[in-house]
Amino acid sequence: MDDIIVAQKIVGNTYSNISNKAIFHEYSSVYKSSNEMLSKINKYTKEKKDILTVTASGDQILNFICNGTINIDTFDISRFASYFLFLKLAAIKNLTKDEYIEFFFEAIFTYDEKYDDMYYTLRKDLNKKAKDFWDSLFDYFDWYDIYNSYLFSSDEKSIGFIEKENIYLKEKNYNKLKDMIDKVNINIYNSDIFTLEELYKNKYDLIYLSNIINYVDKIKYRKLLSKFNLKENGTILTYFFDINENIKKLFLEENYKFYSFKDTTAKVMQYKNK
């Protein structure tokens, strides 16, 4: 089915995108915000010009841009993720930080026409495909209904957590980001991690794979890392909310390093070419 038709049916509760076979699939729900402690990985992502990353909520991409990234290849198995990323990018260019937070993280609590007004303020900076997608929803539904549908994941974080973990939401960075967005080249790929062969030839300063490892075969994932083409001092980061020793035993070579963070079980694995 067409993306727009599927999205309308999901919001209108006439189609279910909840699958017993796979958590993540072509029309799986999108995260409203990252549930990862992105502030912990910030030091590993500074001044990385060329990046490959999962799309997800788009938050890490906005952080990367703040840190100097100019070329971004981004992939997600869900076809909805890229539409949401472009919505956030357009919103940043047109809304104040407080309006942005209200639109994306407070709209879940209330019906209000002001959210429609915010959308029609930002829509001029959407590309045609994203504009057609979001117009098709706002023409028939309130933002409250859209944002509380299964188009989005119910896994939500507090506004306090979101502001703390995302450097792009610091007032100074947010205002700088408004001018930086148009200088960034973003390429979208609707793909899972194992079907990115066309990108193996590209050279990256950083590849961010979030916690994808938790949902795939670990041996297959390990083999995949060596297929990517990293620049000198380039790295691949894998995020863990927690990790057991059996998984760590799969990554004992010297080009794998694990880093822990204070006051959390979260860890990051850094991979570098030998």
Label every PLM stretch briefly.
Residues 208, 232-244:
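Conserved beta-strand signature within the Rossmann-like core of class I S-adenosyl-L-methionine
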